[in-house]
Every structure is written in C-alpha cells, then in structure tokens.
Amino acid sequence: MGGTALNEIVKKVKIAEDVFDFWIHSPSVSKEARPGQFVVIRLHEKGERIPLTVADTKPEEGLFRMVVKVVGKTTHELSLKKEGDTILDVVGPLGNPSEIENYGNVLLVGGGVGIATLYPIAKALKEAGNNITTVLGARTKDYLIMVDEFKEISDVLLVTDDGSAGMKGVVTDAMDKLFRERKFDICWAVGPTIMMKFCTLKAREFGVPIWVSLNPIMVDGTGMCGACRVTVSGQIKFACVDGPEFRGEEVDWDELLKRLAQYREQEKISYERFLKTAGESE
C-alpha cells in the first residue's frame, strides 16, 4: 500500500439502499482498533465531526472498514466520495473496547446499520470460544446487510418488518423465541436507540445481562464537549470515553431518546440546504 495516501478511500461498495461499505487506509487505526471502538471523521475544513464505528480491520494492509447509512448532510457527502478520494481527518480509535471473554452462549441482536457494529464483536467472541446466535433485523430484505459474513461465524435468524426475509416481526419477537428455546449467558444489542431500549426490556424479562452500544450526539470524542452525556445507573457518563458500550439495564433510555431528538429540526434544515446546494451545483 506504499502509494496509498493516509485516509484514502481504497474501496467503496453500495450494499443496500443508502448504505455504503468503505475501506479506509489508516495504518494506525487498522492496527490499534478493537471491537466496539469508533473513529471521528471530518470530511473537509468546514465539515462537522461525526462518529463512525470501526466495522473490521486489515492491519496487514493498513485498512479499516466503515459501514455508513446516509441519514443527513455529512453522511450524504461521504456517500458521494469515490475510491481514491481522501477524508481530511480520521481520529481514533476512540472509546472502550467490548468486554470479550468466554461467556458460553451469546445472543447478538443487530438492527439496520447497527449490524456492522456487531460484526467485529461477533468475530472476537467467536475467537474467544463462545457459541454465537445472531438476530439480524431490518425493515425489508433489501436493508439486511452482512448476512453471509455473520453466517460464517454464528447461527443466524433473520427478521424483517414485512416478512420478506426470515421471521415477520421485530427483533424482540426473535429474542423472545430464542430465550424460550435455550439459555443464553449474555446478550449484545446494537441498532436504533428505540430498538436497544426494547431489547433491554426483553433481556431483563428473561434475566439475561445485555450490552448496548450507544450513539448519542458526539463532537470531539474525548469527553471535552459533553454532548454525548448519558445517565447510567443514575450517574452522568460520556459515551465517547466511558462507552460507547454500557449495560442496557443501567441506561436511562427515555432521557437519551429525548436528547437525541433535541437537534432534529436543525439537522433537517442543514440537510435540506445541503441537498439544495448540491442540486444547484450539478
């Protein structure tokens, strides 16, 4: 990779509607990143900083992977980048790694693009000798990602809202079914915040401890700005330095959901302005 620039996009593939799979050249991130960690990127001098999970690494090639869903201005800008383009800043790896050990029977639950966050965790848990069962959920089969990769390392149960792949329903329906069929020692859930809240309630119903990966608003990624604060066991924590993973049963979900909605109108305005400007420049 001698001729590859730092933070260069080496590979980019569209893997679902509005979901893109990137491999980025960063020897330090690829070497140091552990399952559960993330990077903060900035596309250009006037760009905002956004956190994105490290979905996989190839240390021997100096590459790390990001799977990104277009949800706003910056992720849309990133989706327009081409192979050979570079990202101005990539800071990381940040956050605490997942607590990987041999638990026994482990249930992993991924929703939407959260599936990508689960992948390195699943690989590490498999290498630690765990028996893994994975529930992958999406609105329709067209939004399910990385299914074959998970099938290589775990038993997989698919769930879609419309029944176009696997079970018809939501991921907690699959959790209920699996918890009744066998004993699980621990669970991970990664996906939309509302999904993780209900996964936590379902795990608690069956007495199974659960880890969740939180995605609050984040700016600097070092605990300075305080934007990512969450209440865990009645104490203020920063997702960027204390997390991003926390025990689900300890999270104040209603407060987190309220905070996530705080800037939704501003985010919408910013995105609409960007789309208008982008359209005029074409």
Curated annotation (Swiss-Prot):
Residues 2-100 form the FAD-binding FR-type domain. One of its GO terms (molecular function) is metal ion binding. The keyword Isomerase does not apply. InterPro entries: Cbr1-like_FAD-bd_dom (IPR008333), Cyt_c3_hydrogenase_gsu (IPR012165), Dihydroorotate_DH_Fe-S-bd (IPR019480), FAD-bd_FR_type (IPR017927), FNR_nucleotide-bd (IPR039261), OxRdtase_FAD/NAD-bd (IPR001433), PyrK_electron_transfer (IPR050353), Riboflavin_synthase-like_b-brl (IPR017938). Its cofactor is [2Fe-2S] cluster; FAD. CDD domains: DHOD_e_trans_like1 (cd06219). Gene3D superfamilies: Nucleotide-binding domain of ferredoxin-NADP reductase (FNR) module, Translation factors. GO terms for biological process: pyrimidine nucleotide biosynthetic process. Keywords: 2Fe-2S, Electron transport, FAD, Flavoprotein, Iron, Iron-sulfur, Metal-binding, Transport. This is Dihydroorotate dehydrogenase B (NAD(+)), electron transfer subunit homolog. [2Fe-2S] cluster binds at C225, C228, C240. Binds 1 [2Fe-2S] cluster per subunit. Belongs to the PyrK family. It comes from the Bacteria.
